[in-house]
Amino acid sequence: MENQVTQLLKAMVKPDYTACSYAFMQDGKIVCADAIGVIDKINNQPITTDCTFNVCSISKIYCTVCIMQLVDEGLIQLEDKVSDILPEFTMKDKRYKDITVRMCLDHSSGLPGTQWKHFSVSTISKFDYYSEVLNYLSNSTLKADPGTYSTYCNDGFTLAEMVVSKVRNMPYEDVLKKYITEKISAKSTNTTYTIHSDYPLVSEGKKPKEYFPIQGAGGITTSMIDLCKFGQLFLEPNSIISEKSKALMAKSWGTTFLELDLGAIDFGLGWGLVRHHDPDYDFGDGVLAKGGNSMFFSSRLIIVPKYNAVLALSETHDCGLDVPTTLMRLFNTYLEPNTYPDYSGIYAHAFGLQKITTIKSSMVVQDKTEKGWIMSDLLNYSNGKWTNEKGNQIFFEGDYLLKTTRNRTVAFAQKAKKQELNSVWKSRLNKKYIVYDTTFYDIVTNQMLCSVEFNRTEDTLSLIVHGNKSEPVVSEFPIEVIDDTHAQSYLNTPCNGSRDRIEPYFEDGKLYCASYTYICEDDIEPYNSQLFEKENQVYKINNTLEVLPTICENHRILVLDANGDLYYDSMDVEEYKPIESGFIILV
């Protein structure tokens, strides 16, 4: 059975997402971990927890540990000047000689920020990235005196990476392997130049694989389970990094010249947040956090001493998650008892369907769209109601869903009816029914009801209404089958919850619905330059329609696309553009 954390995550991601993975470690053991989606949208191979994600700037913690190891061994000191260790590092601005190793780690170096060229690449071929960085810096100036204020800076960690490689006299990727990943058995954790085929790297959609020559600032790729193994170093004594160095990393080193600025001072050494307190989640004191973002990925690592826990999550951007808050919500769900009411299900309202997923104290509201279910609201439970961040509330009275917005409570939806369909109704599903009897002056079919189709979603039947996609009025009507020829709306929610009742029925091969007559696409003949007749005519466009018939007074042409949505209407003033397929209605 799928765990509740994964159920919640699946309800939150966008329908066309590629991949997402998370892991929780407590007391040194993985207690909950999963991966959803596919490795890429080319081969659609299902993802596993062994697959790796680019965790980007979380790499800065690895780089900082490498530096602190040098400090622990007495090979360097944090206040050493970078230019003394790397004489090849020069800048136009002579103040660069004041930059210390520590300033590279707490973002106060004053360096420009990011050497963007080849920051992210699509090849694992190794090239001299250090030379590119040094050349870029040699033609740059500082944004401030070193140590004046902290502002996010990738360049500092590239220099720190160079320091590690220089002092160890070996490639940075080899340092990581020898001094960190091999010691914690994190086999999936690598850089661009040491990626292992047993731990496939995820790609967003059909985009290229993303690799990072900028290793110290953003080049780590890892599974979430192995990321947790690394995070565990900060919760227990170990031989990899000393307690003294961990304490220094967790200290607030960030600096600012603005009295009320609380952001810059949250920088530790490598850590993005060393005074992490969230108003919605009581994770206690001493929480450390670091995020990472690239062109295709977002990731988060959180250390929670209160629960002796390490939390890790990474997504491809098409998941659409707020990664920091999502990770905290997922872990909170893992911790919570199963004592909350469950109102999960499909709910029907006057304009369509919503899916409610309640998992412990979290509620996810999803709207039905052409692409699938898309999250539209996220709420938390308290005292019989769910409340979102705006203060709007949802609660239930029997099978009815009520909403409170700006102190006004209204009935909004009711539990959707599920119904088995016979072969007659199954044969009608997902076919387009094109309006036949509109008039040259009817604006309604310019906006909606120019075509309809029957759709079944999770055993719930509805009538999809197609119209002007740029100005949609209504999308679908939940209905139930009465007999082989009749269906009807079943909503009886007060206020606006059941405002427009429809009763589609079939007679003599035609569909009658909402005062209009519709013809099934199966019964529509192809368009071959036919002209207007005395009665309305509907045709199917099978070949590119370059030119429309001439329109005289009190006549009208509607062109629908293959999906049944309005593409062109002579009632509007817009110019017609050729379409490859669809329907044409001569009115």
Regions found by a protein language model. Give the residues of each.
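Catalytic loop of the DD-peptidase/beta-lactamase superfamily, centered on the K-T-G motif
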Residues: 1-35, 177, 210-587
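Conserved hydrophobic/aromatic "anchor" residues
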Residues: 32, 53, 85, 172, ...
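Active-site donor-binding loop signature of nucleotide-sugar glycosyltransferases
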Residues: 38, 88, 315
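Short, surface-exposed loop or secondary-structure junction motifs
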Residues: 29, 35, 40, 94-301
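Secondary-structure transition/hinge residues
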Residues: 13, 71, 75, 90, ...
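Glycine-rich, histidine-containing beta strand-loop boundary motifs that form or position
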Residues: 80-82, 108, 176, 314
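Hydrophobic alpha-helical segments typical of transmembrane helices
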Residues: 8, 66, 100, 133, ...
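Short active-site loop at a secondary-structure junction
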Residues: 4, 11-23, 42-104, 143-155, ...
